[in-house]
Amino acid sequence: ATVCYNAASLIERTINSVEEQDYPHVEHLIIDGNSQDATLEAVHHYQERNSVARVPHEVNCLSEPDHGIYDAMNKALRMATGHYILFLNAGDTLHSRQTLSLVACAATAAYGDHALPEADDSDLGMLPAVVYGQTDIVDEQGHFLRHRRLTAPEVLTWRAFRHGMTVCHQAFFARTDLARRMVYNTAYRFSADYDWCIR
């Protein structure tokens, strides 16, 4: 899911990153806070390109006023239908065009194949609650600058967050059925993602 507001200068990078993914089962939710710039125009062009793509992704856009980023992220949680949800907001990008395929492979390792199960609660329980990775810092052109200061631990527990947000939400793939039970606390202006990841 991509949350944005007046993000015309940033949204193309994110759209292109998702559009390039080689994983065929992508649901891209774009939750826009009623942008007044060219953000929605870029999203509509994306939807048009996607409609004629060889392997189209499902692209849905909701544009309406919200009460901040975490309210918008909660809207995405309610709309999501996939097995996992990732918040890749305007300006964020995935590491490579294989990122989502690699995540699906990691999530389904217990199955011995690379196909996610049908959306059946009994099958979903076999999938890991979270799949996560490292985060790189890049410049405006997308060139690598450095690895993020806090590195993701080998095993993720709530204790790993004692020293800060060890896994960025941009690298935190949460199982949708579980994530939906723990909405973002909109009372927090800046740290609701930290609180959400711990829960």
Where would I find each of the regions flagged by the language model?
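Nucleotide-sugar donor-binding/catalytic module of glycosyltransferases
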Residues: 1-199
